[in-house]
């Protein structure tokens, strides 16, 4: 089974602002190769039996589809961010127990690639890079490093993920649908909702009337408390 682990670097963080994918780093578990020509890396991703990446359902695959609408990967998609959240839901406890030597406290409990870079002793290169407008050596190194971290992370997670394939597949499909809803919204039947509201209101009125008949108001006369009773809210002579 051909498996490709990948990462891309774009010129913007928001999908709608992306106008260019600078580079794509690919690995089949061995050396990581960097591509800048989409005609080279797009077919590899499309034809792979399995594609793996970190946060690719929410970002990378969406970004590629944004610029290349005909992009249609045929293989299975595995997002290590989702798998990590599934299998390491107690990551904050793990971090405090391990007390990673070089890991900043603000990284504790996070599932970002930068955080996993510290945990796997493969620190993310140029994590503080701010300029994504043009392709640079730093951006290329960052892209390749992200893939190297993802490869190492997936090697750790894969044995556990393989033991629960249905759960992993379900999470991937669910994340894909949620991602689509976040971008496109979802249909809402306004007419049907109003009809349902009217039907519920009518039933509530019917139930209210039945309750009034079943439990009628009882006139107990006038009651004047002789002394204060804080628990019942009584005030003497009132």
Where are these regions (language model features)?
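A general structural motif
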Residues: 1, 47-49
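Generic structural signal of hydrophobic/aromatic residues within well-ordered alpha-helices
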Residues: 41, 83, 113-117, 207, ...
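Conserved "right-hand" nucleotidyltransferase catalytic core of DNA-directed polymerases
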Residues: 1-9, 21, 103-108, 124, ...
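Active-site-proximal helix-loop-helix substrate-binding element of RNase H-like nuclease domains
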Residues: 14, 19, 26, 30-36, ...
């Amino acid at each position: 089974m051909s498996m490709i682990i990948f990462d891309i670097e774009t010129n913007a963080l928001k999908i709608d602002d992306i106008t260019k994918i600078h580079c794509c780093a690919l690995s089949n578990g061995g050396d990581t190769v960097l591509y800048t020509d989409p005609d080279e890396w797009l077919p590899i991703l499309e034809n792979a039996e399995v594609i793996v990446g970190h946060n690719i359902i929410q970002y990378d695959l969406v970004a590629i589809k944004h610029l290349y609408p005909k992009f249609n990967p045929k293989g299975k998609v595995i997002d290590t961010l989702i798998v990590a959240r599934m299998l390491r839901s107690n990551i904050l406890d793990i971090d405090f127990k391990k007390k990673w030597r070089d890991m900043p406290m603000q990284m504790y409990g996070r599932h970002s690639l930068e955080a996993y870079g510290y945990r796997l002793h493969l620190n993310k290169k140029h994590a503080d890079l701010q300029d994504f407008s043009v392709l640079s050596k730093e951006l290329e190194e960052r892209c390749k490093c992200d893939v190297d971290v993802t490869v190492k992370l997936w090697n750790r997670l894969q044995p556990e993920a393989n033991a629960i394939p249905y759960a992993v597949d379900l999470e991937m499909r669910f994340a894909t649908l949620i991602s689509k809803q976040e971008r496109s919204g979802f249909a809402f039947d306004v007419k049907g909702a109003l009809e349902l509201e009217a039907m519920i209101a009518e039933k509530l009125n019917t139930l209210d009337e039945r309750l009034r008949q079943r439990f009628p108001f009882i006139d107990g006369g006038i009651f004047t408390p002789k002394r204060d009773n804080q628990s019942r809210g009584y005030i003497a002579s009132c």
